[in-house]
Amino acid sequence: MVDPIVTKNWRDLIKPRGLVVDQDSLSNTYGKFVAEPLERGFGITLGNSLRRVLLSSLQGAAITSVKVEGVEHEFMTIPEVAEDVTDIILNLKEVLLQIHTNDVKTIRIEADGPKEIKAGDLITDAQVEVLNPGHHILTISEGGRVRAEMTARRGRGYVPAERNKIPGSPIGTIPIDALFSPIRKVNYQVTNARVGQQTDYDKLTLEVWTDGSVAPADAVAFAAKIVKEQLSIFINFDEAEEPAEEIKPVEEQKLNENLFRSVDELELSVRSANCLQNANIKTIGDLVQKTEAEMLKTKNFGRKSLKEIKEILAEMGLSLGMKLENWPPKAAPQGGAPKV
């Protein structure tokens, strides 16, 4: 058991207020995430770790081999088919799959011309989902016929064709190099974050692009879980339980003195100040109880004003959407709060 005094090594470090997701740009293939404030240096430490794990360690699915009836190797052509086998293989590499099992799955093409074969025409079972059904694979002319069988499975990272060879496969089976990773790109940026009057903390901004088989937020969560599991082996002690914090009755809790200040003291832009006045918001305590959605419904109040207010409140350790019991209190604290 570790001495409680020693635990101050990590408990005294500042932690992010939470992970903020940019809802305006969020999609099934892109996400932008912000974590702040972080201790100096932790932005690069966490950003680089998450980026490397995202790119290398998340599982995805891909086609790993193909066998086309009448074809012995990838440099042949198929009668009445516009693409040669090499082009068909390149197109198969770009088929996006989601496989809901760890088993190797079989996918087939059975078609007669004239017909354009797209990813949505692949014959699969219920455990295989094609995510880009409009993706072009090959074109069959009049009188043409294609019968092909492919294997697909889940995996991690990039696997060259040589490693996708299956012993005992029928003659004519062509292994395909596979990119299993569902992550297409990861960027991170570290800038300064402010806590009170100090500006030497880190702000981590992480951007993630995926192929759509995994949501960006889930991808970040999976990567963080992998890092956590890998680091757990280095912890060789149990922590002493901290004594439960005494919960004071609401009326005894000390409120942030800034809550009692007038919104006029925030030195907002004229537009933002007028919006608060029109909404009958007089004190900072009145303001912080409003949610972002409620503020955006205020006449002439836009996202620029929202950003301005959120940044000023953050400097005071406050935020929108707070719940203040018994507000306003019977008596405001004596003296004023310092200006921002």
Curated annotation (Swiss-Prot):
- Recorded GO CC terms: cytoplasm; DNA-directed RNA polymerase complex
- Transcription: is it a keyword of this entry? yes
Q: Which CDD domains match?
A: RNAP_alpha_NTD
Pfam families the record matches: RNA_pol_A_bac, RNA_pol_A_CTD, RNA_pol_L
- Where are the residues of the annotated region Alpha C-terminal domain (alpha-CTD)? 255-340
InterPro entries, alphabetized = DNA-dir_RNA_pol_insert, DNA-dir_RNA_pol_RpoA/D/Rpb3, DNA-dir_RpoA, RBP11-like, RNAP_asu_C, RNApol_insert_sf
GO biological process: one example: DNA-templated transcription
Query: Which keywords label this protein?
Result: DNA-directed RNA polymerase, Nucleotidyltransferase, Transcription, Transferase
User: Any idea of its EC number?
Assistant: 2.7.7.6
One GO MF term attached to the UniProt entry:
protein dimerization activity
The similarity annotation says: Belongs to the RNA polymerase alpha chain family.
Q: What does this protein do?
A: DNA-dependent RNA polymerase catalyzes the transcription of DNA into RNA using the four ribonucleoside triphosphates as substrates.
- What does the domain comment read? The N-terminal domain is essential for RNAP assembly and basal transcription, whereas the C-terminal domain is involved in interaction with transcriptional regulators and with upstream promoter elements.
Quaternary assembly: Homodimer. The RNAP catalytic core consists of 2 alpha, 1 beta, 1 beta' and 1 omega subunit. When a sigma factor is associated with the core the holoenzyme is formed, which can initiate transcription.
Protein name according to UniProt = DNA-directed RNA polymerase subunit alpha
